[in-house]
Amino acid sequence: MGFISVSVGDGMGDICRDLGADYLIEGGQTMNPSTEDVLKAIEQVHAKNIFVFPNNKNIILAANQARDLTEDKNIIVIPTKTIPPGYHGNDQLCAGEDGGAEYRGDAAVHRHVKTGQVTYAVRDTKIDDKEIRQGNIMGIGDHGILAVGEGVEGITMETIDAMVDEDTEIISVYYGSDVSAEDAQRLGEKLEERYPDFDVEVNDGGQPIYYYVVSVE
């Protein structure tokens, strides 16, 4: 059984490898791998059953096309739209009764793992009835804009506040290449103060564009 993940940032890649990824494809919002890129990855993984985690809605089509073009291996595309559900998706892999591979829990992964991404606006716009100015910091959730404002830390906190609920147990924070370790650690400490009953994890994601990628589960 093999595991291919699309990742962006050295830290994100390291985490994927630690979780058992056999092959990483560089991707992200501005670097969308092609069908050929996914096919090359499939060729490099020596397994009959291979799970592919696109981790971006724009890459799911390419992954599905690569699956359809592959005849000698069983390719299972898990339609993850962001990286955190892809991390947790690996825990749902198991062997089928016939020795093949099955994926149990795709719906559960998407239901229980919420993702938030904090970035900046490149132009003036209006989304989800929110006025956004060029340079504003935005917190984006699974279903739209959660927070808009001026400060990265403050908007990240607002984004997480909007994501947590009574079932939340873990908050995982992945800080990007434009965030210092000190700033990320300070954010983690504030989260621990605000949510003392939750496990708070701070990781160096190294991703560009997004100051923070957050998962809440």
Short names for language-model regions:
Residues 1-217:
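N-terminal loops that bind phosphate or other acidic moieties
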